[in-house]
Regions:
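Short active-site oxyanion
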Residues: 31-33, 54-57, 127-128
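PLP-dependent aminotransferase-like
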Residues: 41-103
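Short, well-ordered coil/turn elements that cap or connect secondary structure elements
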Residues: 28-30, 77-78, 97, 124-126
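Short glycine/serine/threonine-biased micro-segments
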Residues: 37, 60, 111
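Active-site phosphate-binding strand-loop segment of PLP-dependent enzymes
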Residues: 86-131
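Noncatalytic linker/hinge segments flanking ATPase motor cores
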Residues: 11-16, 73-78, 123-125
């Protein structure tokens, strides 16, 4: 397939994956699947724009998760996020917070070697997302 995301075979494969996910999730017309690869700063901008409605809470315990938290913190259209951090080798925990519509955490931080078992936040506002 080549190594560049600009190669026709790669673009074709990504298109098939997006179409398949759209079909799997029965997405309405006009909805799109966004894919990003590791280190894709543009993906964090897309996620900040399209997944967080107003306020987010983050578990930040490595490079991957901290980038999303920083991106949301810099987004002028969003409220100030709550960011929970921890000592190296450990992971913080979410706390239910009124007005938070998105809770975001990595499952596995390769930069620190910490992995968690994601779970919905007890007593979170109705409709809050867990990413």
């Amino acid at each position: 397939m080549g190594t560049s995301h600009r190669q026709k075979p790669v673009k074709s494969l990504v298109g098939r994956v997006r179409a398949g996910l759209s079909e799997l999730f029965s997405l309405p017309d006009g909805y799109e699947v966004v894919l990003g690869n590791g280190g894709a700063t543009a993906f964090w901008d897309i996620a900040a724009f399209g997944l967080v409605n107003d306020r987010a809470q983050f578990l930040s315990f490595g490079e991957f998760g901290s980038k999303f938290a920083k991106g949301v913190g810099a987004a002028p259209h969003l409220g100030i996020p709550t960011i929970h951090t921890s000592d190296p080798g450990d992971a913080p925990a979410f706390t239910a917070e009124q007005g938070v519509d998105t809770y975001a955490t990595p499952q596995n931080e390769t930069s620190t070697g910490v992995a968690i078992t994601p779970a919905r936040v007890a007593n979170a506002d109705d409709g809050a997302l867990l990413l």
